[in-house]
Amino acid sequence: QIRNKSQKDLQQDFKKAFSKAEELANRVQLKTPDPYLNTLGGALATAADGIWEAPAYLHGSVAWRMHLNAWRGAYVADPLGWHDRAKTHFSSYANSQVLEPESGPVVPDTSRHFARQKEKIGTSMFSRGYIYRHPNKNTVAHHYDMNLVFFDQLLKHFQWSGDVEYIKELWPTLKRHLAWEKRNFDTDGDGLYDAYAAIWASDALQYSGGGVVYTSAYNYSANKMAAKLASIIGENPQAYEEEAEKIKNAIQQELWIQEKGIFAEYKDLLGEQNLHEQPGIWSV
């Protein structure tokens, strides 16, 4: 404790802390003609270290300083050379994947005016494949779909590391996730996926079962990569290749607006099945 330390001890502690901060800030160095741009490496490394709390990344370094499995944190690990942190993060959350039941009923939460699914293990969303917000714990439900971005981070880690043994280890985790996404968010099997509190832009982004461009794109990418990984580890890639192709065709045929040269944000599930022609910046 500080009150029990001498002035000399405190001085040494300060020097150690300052030295560590300086080392961290110099982890990534940019050398460009722009002196303001050159500060970004230190800012990124310092901020990235600030959201690490073993065994996983936090949602924020100041506000929302708590564990949540996705949306941004783990993306920083591999580019900054923290491959060990990346692996620890992904493994701890693989342990948070729900295994049973295999599926469940769709149960809107009446206390939330049907705006959310009931947060209870055993409903459709909180069944096999779902990953809970805290590492190393799979017995509690939480309303986000953070699976979507978490597995995008994991697949990018595989590309960074090329660790075949780790790919084999987490292959069942990936398979359960892809089945969970399909079961919950492409219930009509048309290749377009619904979105439910799935990305960083807002907790409130949901589309009442519609076919959404950005979640469909994430699932296209995940299935495409799963097919490649399957071939590497001796699994059958066919189902993932077929799903990726189905998603790609659905996006092109149902969401592309030729005269505007853009993809629609989403297509309504019910009624006239209208296209919503003003995509969010996250979709562009």
Whereabouts are the PLM-identified features?
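Mature extracytoplasmic enzyme cores
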Residues: 1, 23-47, 51, 209, ...
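Extended acidic/polar, glycine-enriched regions
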Residues: 1-26
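Substrate-binding groove/exosite segments of carbohydrate-active enzymes
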Residues: 19-169, 262-269, 273-284
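Alpha-helical positions within canonical tetratricopeptide repeat
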Residues: 85, 166-169, 173, 236-239, ...
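Catalytic cores of carbohydrate-active enzymes
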Residues: 104-106, 185-201, 208-214, 218-284
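Active-site cavity-forming subdomains of large catalytic enzyme subunits
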Residues: 173-181, 185-189
